[in-house]
Curated annotation (Swiss-Prot):
Pathway: Antibiotic biosynthesis; bacilysin biosynthesis. This is Prephenate decarboxylase. It catalyses: prephenate + H(+) = 3-[(4R)-4-hydroxycyclohexa-1,5-dien-1-yl]-2-oxopropanoate + CO2. GO terms for cellular component: cytoplasm. One of its GO terms (biological process) is antibiotic biosynthetic process. It comes from Bacillus amyloliquefaciens (Bacillus velezensis).
Length: 204
């Protein structure tokens, strides 16, 4: 995608920026991916005069499927996501941009009425997205058992709903679900890739 005057230019066609583009990323609300996508929309698409909306999905793979349907659909993926390597290999996708956006603060969150003690880490199961779990290792030096879910926001929701007691999550999800941090770790320095629909040409 190239922003040129009043159009979005691909190799084969130009689209008026009056058309709405969609930025797809991982949901639900409260994910670090949503935070990064909103940052991208504010600092890139709006400044370029491009009309855009945000669409949240359960998996990055679902985001990519939407992107493959139209050159006006894009997907933002963090480089911490292990499955991103497959997206780079696909001939029907193209890497359009890489940008940095550090995540919100990460920490261990519990319900306000839950009585947390540090020794719980030796036996408790912590609900988390797979990507940030090494924060526990580096900051607590403990070998913790995890219950893995699709996003940090989903982890926080499980604690809010009483399905788990401790979540590794971010500040946005903590606020959204009314949890409190019992430990804070760090805002994770992160880079992100923006993918668009590729243009495949047969070579015979």
């Amino acid at each position: 995608m190239i922003i040129l005057d009043n159009s979005i230019q691909t190799k084969s066609k130009a689209y008026s920026i009056s058309k709405l583009i969609t930025i797809n990323t991982l949901g639900p609300e409260g994910t670090s991916s949503e935070y990064a996508a909103k940052n991208f929309i504010t600092n890139f698409t709006l400044l370029q005069g491009v009309n855009s909306k945000l669409s949240l999905h359960d998996t990055f793979e679902s985001c990519i499927e939407k992107t493959l349907q139209s050159p006006l659909e894009y997907t933002i993926v963090p480089h911490a996501y292990d499955g991103i390597k497959h997206f780079y290999m696909r001939p029907d996708l193209q890497l359009l941009q890489i940008f940095r956006c550090d995540t919100p603060m990460y920490g261990l969150a519990v319900r306000p009425d839950f009585e947390y003690t540090d020794d719980m880490l030796d036996k408790a199961v912590i609900v988390s997205h797979p990507s940030p779990i090494n924060l526990i290792k580096y900051f607590t030096r403990k070998d913790v058992t995890f219950d893995l879910v699709n996003s940090t926001s989903a982890a926080a929701k499980r604690v809010k709903d009483g399905l788990s007691d401790i979540a590794l999550t971010n500040e946005l999800a903590r606020q959204k679900y009314g949890l409190q941090f019992v430990k804070t770790f760090k805002s994770i320095p992160m880079s992100w890739s923006l993918f668009g629909k590729g243009e495949i040409h047969d070579e015979n």
